[in-house]
Curated annotation (Swiss-Prot):
It is found in: Nucleus. Gene3D superfamilies: 1.10.8.60, 2.30.30.490, P-loop containing nucleotide triphosphate hydrolases (3.40.50.300). Residues 218-343 are annotated as: Disordered. It comes from Saccharomyces cerevisiae (strain ATCC 204508 / S288c) (Baker's yeast). This is Origin recognition complex subunit 1. The gene is ORC1. Mg(2+) binds at residues 566-567.
Length: 914
């Protein structure tokens, strides 16, 4: 919300104690540990305070209107910000699902079974526009979007003040619902606000989520009866001995599920000796729904019908003091009977009076066992597996409430509930042979995904077919970097998520795994299982859990999962087991898994993966070719839309851009501008865009490189503009280096000379307030981008060093390996010389390199100055070399990109003709 204190300009952070007294920095250090404090923000201009439980009206740029939130927490000094403001989201009337509303509150009405548009229109006419619906969805607020403080009241107070309310400030809340606008539950908003202020933020959010969940019936089991005061022996019978929670007049609740075993359960089956309880005989049951940092539950032994209970007599000294009645005369004040008292575990002492078991040891054992227990070990049979779609911890239901930023990007716009999707446009033709053409006609791809319409349609059809039929499939997407592979897949998933949100297709879970972001390849198992179940297991336990989930869990008890494996090249291992597992899971009958693998290598399956993996990838392969110059031109025009003929204000002394309030008109702005500030119009010529797209398309077809060239060209044009008018940066006048060395091809030189006069005329035509990006600026940017310092260095190397690199590139092309032995490179150099024996220049070079035809010096087996050439390439960072005694079998590898090495070699005319 505020990364620095500068972002809090106009606001101050206030901290108060339990009595409401303001605490300064010195008092904070003197306060005792555990003392409760409250934080709130105060605006200096009007004294408005924002704290927990307050409702605020914020501007919503995506919806073009305002939204209302209830502040839940102020986080100070986080990892990225000085202060963060997190709030619960209210839904307004147009964000509610009208059909779900009428089904819940008017189930017998005659208005049911009507078209969806009918409910939208009816609800817009009858709904109270100032009624809000509270949700448990968290969102981070930005202070610059703050409008005003909202006055939220319950239904009874609203009825009293109904005729005298401010529609922009006063609101009423009667229900809490899910973020999708369904399942309404009656609440008292005043009680909710009081509860949020009283408890911790995490507990408050869990409380609100529990309100929207369906209530579960729990069996009530009576707790232990009170012992007689005179009794000094304890009898534990009809069960295995267990350590129990001892409370005053408290009834315990126990889940009677016998098919599901928690991963923290520890089975104990040894016999017990009279008067002594062994540490191995205690079992700790950890509630999965509680936080791991809570105090652990006291160990209990489960009832077993097979074993016969024993009576264990405890001496007077062995009985815990907590089970004895409190003293009558003196003693501490009794605790609230509604709150259970945590007691120490009943443990015996050995002869040396050392405790048998420690709490923290049992807690660590339970945590460790949980991380190593796979999902498959928790069920005794397949029939015992519950419906995973109804469990709140599965499929990221809890994490989505916390990750509101990601959720806001994927959910539909809040302006209207129904969004027209591709599915809704072509659903009638989905079974026809013209479905691909219909998809291409249904959306204007030029507005957000130019030149990738066919690839979009192919991926969309494959993914849609698998989701609709509850089947599994694999989609292999390949192409060079920067051709729109990941962007296209994300647009497909975004479109499918919109259709899923409107119940057009079944719901599914989307997981994105990037191979470059994994510390080790096996981390992908942990990431995927964490997204599916919300648990964090070891990679081995996660892999076993995923195997069981995709193979054994029935289809009707789980969702479809769409996994994007981006940067697949980085996940290839020597054993290839990771790739095999992911692609093999899609062959299971119950999988419901869609794997979209994105790689930068066209023939990765055939080159680096075995036959068993290649056969499981299938035939759905979509190849992304490089962009043509026309497509790159369209992309640049799309990205630069709104840039041409845009204005900015610049300080002529410092060169800094000045931000001007857009509310005022041009005349008012000119009157308020200082003398040193000028208004400048930015313009990029069509010829500059044309040459940028053509040059990049001829090299790689990388859209990112083309945009990078345009950005750099704009920076060069800015420097030219500042130098032309004598302006400066930070008080220093900009001077262009006219003697700066540039490397151009012959074709580039002719193009620059032919356009130089035209650019000079354009500069003369431009007035002082126009900054134009000409073709010369683009050529300089291309020279910097395409001809890097590495390429410049390599073009100036000796012919011997160039011949070495050229031979290395030839070997890499022949056998497809990145590492080559030095002996093979020497043989390749000799082969190149023999093959080009008709080339007089090559033959003369060979005589020089191997000292051939000399009377005084015998012919050399190695190239002359071999060690010098090799060390020169190693010191420059162009090569990696393996350290071995035998140089001939040492392996070398390029430390630069292959494209840069090829481009540098192509600069040499002799090597280009070999």
């Amino acid at each position: 919300m505020a990364k620095t204190l500068k972002d809090l300009q106009g606001w101050e952070i206030i901290t108060t104690d339990e009595q409401g007294n303001i605490i300064d920095g010195g008092q904070k250090r003197l306060r005792r540990r555990g003392a409760k404090t409250e934080h709130y923000l105060k605006r200096s201009s009007d004294g408005i305070k924002l704290g927990r439980g307050d409702s605020v009206v914020m501007h919503n740029e995506a919806a073009g209107t305002y939204s209302v939130y209830m502040i839940q927490e102020l986080r100070l000094n986080t990892l990225n910000n000085v202060v963060e403001l997190w709030a619960l989201t209210y839904l307004r009337w147009f964000e509610v699902n009208p059909l779900a509303h009428y089904r819940q509150f008017n189930p017998d009405a005659n208005i049911l079974n009507r078209p969806l548009n009918y409910y939208n229109k009816l609800f817009s006419e009858t709904a109270n526009k100032n009624e809000l619906y509270l949700t448990a969805e968290l969102a981070e607020l930005q202070l610059f979007n703050f409008i005003r403080v909202a006055n939220v009241m319950d239904g009874s107070k609203w009825e009293v003040l109904k005729g005298n309310v401010d529609p922009e400030r006063d609101f009423t809340v009667r229900y809490i619902c899910e973020p999708t606008g369904e399942k309404f539950v009656d609440i008292n908003i005043e009680d909710v606000k009081a509860y949020i202020k009283k408890v911790e933020p995490r507990e408050a959010q869990e409380y609100l989520k529990d309100l929207t969940l369906p209530s579960k019936k729990k069996e009530i089991k009576r707790g232990p009866q009170k012992k007689d005061k005179a009794t000094q022996t304890a009898q534990i019978s009809d069960a295995e001995t267990r350590a129990t929670d001892i409370t005053d007049n408290e009834d315990g609740n126990e889940d009677e599920s016998s098919d599901y075993e928690s991963p923290s359960d520890i089975d104990v089956s040894e016999d017990m000796d009279s008067g002594e309880i062994s540490a191995d005989e205690l079992e700790e049951e950890e509630d999965e729904e509680e936080d791991e940092d809570e105090e652990e539950k006291e160990a209990r032994h489960t009832n077993s019908p097979r074993k016969r209970g024993r009576k264990i007599k405890l001496g007077k000294d062995d009985i815990d003091a907590s089970v004895q009645p409190p003293p009558k005369k003196r003693g501490r004040k009794p605790k609230d009977p509604s709150k259970p008292r945590q007691m120490l575990l009943i443990s015996s002492c050995r002869a040396n009076n050392t405790p048998v078991i420690r709490k923290f040891t049992k807690k660590n054992v339970a945590r460790a066992k949980k991380k190593y227990t796979p999902f498959s070990k928790r069920f005794k049979s397949i029939a015992a597996i519950p419906d995973l779609t109804s469990l709140p911890e599965f499929y990221g239901n809890s994490s989505e409430l916390m990750a509101s930023r990601f959720e806001n990007k994927l959910k539909t716009t809040q302006k209207h509930q129904i969004v027209e999707t591709i599915f809704s446009k072509v659903k009638k033709q989905l079974n026809s042979s013209y479905v691909k053409e219909e998809i291409l006609k249904s959306a204007n791809f030029q507005d957000y995904l130019p030149a990738r319409e066919n690839e979009f349609a192919s991926i969309y059809l494959s993914a849609y077919s698998a989701i609709e039929s509850d089947s599994a499939t694999t989609i292999y997407v390949a192409g060079t970097p920067g051709v729109g592979k990941t962007l296209t897949v994300r647009e497909v998933v975004k479109e499918l998520l919109s259709s899923s949100a409107q119940r057009e297709i079944p719901d599914f879970l989307y997981v994105e795994i990037n191979g470059l972001k994994m510390v080790k390849p096996t981390d992908c198992y942990e990431t995927l299982w964490n997204k599916v179940s919300g648990e964090r297991l070891t990679w081995a336990a996660s892999m076993e859990s995923l195997e069981f989930y995709f193979k054994r869990v029935p289809k009707n008890k789980k969702k479809t999962i769409v996994v994007l494996l981006d940067e697949l090249d980085a996940m290839v291992t020597k054993s290839q087991d990771i790739m095999y597992n992911f692609f093999n899971w899609t062959t299971y009958e119950n999988a419901k898994l869609i794997v979209i693998a994105v790689a930068n290598t066209m023939d990765l399956p055939e080159r680096q993966l075995g036959n068993k993996i290649t056969s499981r990838i299938g035939f759905t392969r979509i190849m992304f070719t490089g962009y043509t110059h026309e497509e790159l031109k369209n992309i640049i025009d799309l990205r630069l839309k709104g840039l041409n003929d845009s204005f900015f204000y610049v300080d002529t002394k410092t060169g800094n851009a000045i931000l001007i309030d857009a509310a005022g008109n041009d005349t008012t702005v000119k009157q308020t501008l200082p003398e040193d500030v000028r208004k400048v119009r930015l313009r990029m010529s069509a010829d500059a865009i044309e040459i940028a797209s053509r040059k990049v398309a001829s090299v790689s077809g990388d859209a990112r490189r083309a945009l990078k060239v345009c950005k750099r060209a704009a920076e060069i044009a800015e420097k030219h503009y500042m130098a032309k008018h004598g302006y400066g940066y930070d008080g220093k006048t900009v001077i262009e280096d006219e003697n700066e060395e540039q490397i151009y091809d012959d074709e580039d030189k002719d193009l620059i000379e032919s356009n130089k006069a035209k650019d000079d005329n354009d500069d003369d035509d431009d007035n002082d307030g126009v900054q134009t990006v000409h073709i010369t600026h683009v050529m300089k940017a291309l020279n910097e981008t395409l001809n890097s310092h590495v390429i410049t260095f390599m073009t100036r190397l000796s012919f011997t060093a160039k011949l070495f690199i050229y031979a290395l590139l030839n070997l890499m092309k022949k056998n497809g390996s990145q590492e080559q032995e030095l002996g093979d490179i020497v043989d390749e150099i000799k082969l190149l010389i023999e093959v080009n024996g008709s080339n007089k220049f090559v033959m003369e070079i060979a005589k020089t390199l191997f000292q051939q035809g000399s009377d005084n010096i015998s012919e050399q087996l190695r190239i002359i100055s071999w060690d010098f050439v090799l060390n020169q390439l190693l010191d420059a960072g162009i090569l990696f070399k393996q350290t071995m005694k035998n140089d001939r079998i040492c392996c070398v590898k390029l430390n630069i990109s292959v494209e840069e090495a090829k481009r540098a070699m192509n600069e040499d005319e002799t090597l280009r003709n070999l």
